[in-house]
Amino acid sequence: MASPRLLALLLLLVGAFNAAAAESIRETEVINPQDLLEGRYFSGDLPDDEDVGGPGQEPDDFEWSGSGDLEGPEDKHMLPEVTHPLVPLDNHIPERTGPGGRVPTEPKELEENEVIPKRMSPFDGDEDVSNKVSMSSTAQGSNIFERTEVLSALIVGGIVGILFAVFLVLLLVYRMKKKDEGSYDLGKKPIYKKAPTNEFYA
């Protein structure tokens, strides 16, 4: 007669095998798209889009979609032929006809159409025009403390450092005061107390 533990182990193994077999059958199950239209599936029981295919379609039929580098399947009737009408390509731009279509030819009209920049040219004034261009490495390397972000970071870092030092000193003072009050037992008391050796005679 088998022990109850052995029977329980055997039932557990058989149940696990049946669950694994049922799951593998479910994964390879082919779903007909007509079943979806007839409403045989409930709202949360729909299969994945990858599982739904036309009748007779294998997963290999779908591998030809993508970049188009490879030639497609031999069935040419699946791909419709598109014919584009031939359009002559030239770069001829038609002339505009109308009030704004005339190009000015007289010098006075050309001067009126000129766009004059509003800023002064550096060559117009008495300013000393220098051809020296400051490199980024030399311009920033002159003094790092002239930059506002570096200066603000140093100030904030200094304030945080001072606050940390103040809190550290306050913690040390607090601990020293606690030691002075006697809250810590600094003296060692003997663990074993010697019994009195006085003898009484009657």
Curated annotation (Swiss-Prot):
Glycans are attached at S43, S65, S67. Residues 1-22 form the signal peptide. The keyword Transmembrane helix applies. Keywords: Glycoprotein, Heparan sulfate, Membrane, Proteoglycan, Secreted, Signal, Transmembrane, Transmembrane helix. It comes from Sus scrofa (Pig). Cell surface proteoglycan which regulates exosome biogenesis in concert with SDCBP and PDCD6IP. It is a single-pass type I membrane protein. The keyword Signal applies. PANTHER family: SYNDECAN, SYNDECAN-4. The chain crosses the membrane at residues 153-173. Belongs to the syndecan proteoglycan family. Residues 46-63 have a biased composition (Acidic residues). Residues 174-202 are cytoplasmic. Homodimer. Interacts with CDCP1 and SDCBP. Interacts (via its cytoplasmic domain) with GIPC (via its PDZ domain). Interacts (via its cytoplasmic domain) with NUDT16L1. Interacts with DNM2; this interaction is markedly enhanced at focal ahesion site upon induction of focal adhesions and stress-fiber formation. It comes from the Eukaryota. Residues 41-75, 87-112 are annotated as: Disordered. This is Syndecan-4. Residues 23-152 are extracellular. One of its GO terms (biological process) is cell migration. Shedding, cleavage of the extracellular domain to release a soluble form, is enhanced by a number of factors such as heparanase, growth factor receptor action for example by thrombin or EGF. Physiological events such as stress or wound healing can activate the shedding. PMA-mediated shedding is inhibited by TIMP3. O-glycosylated; contains both chondroitin sulfate and heparan sulfate. Ser-43, Ser-65 and Ser-67 can all be modified by either chondroitin sulfate or heparan sulfate, and the protein exists in forms that contain only chondroitin sulfate, only heparan sulfate and both chondroitin sulfate and heparan sulfate. It is found in: Membrane; Secreted. GO terms for cellular component: cell surface; extracellular region; membrane.
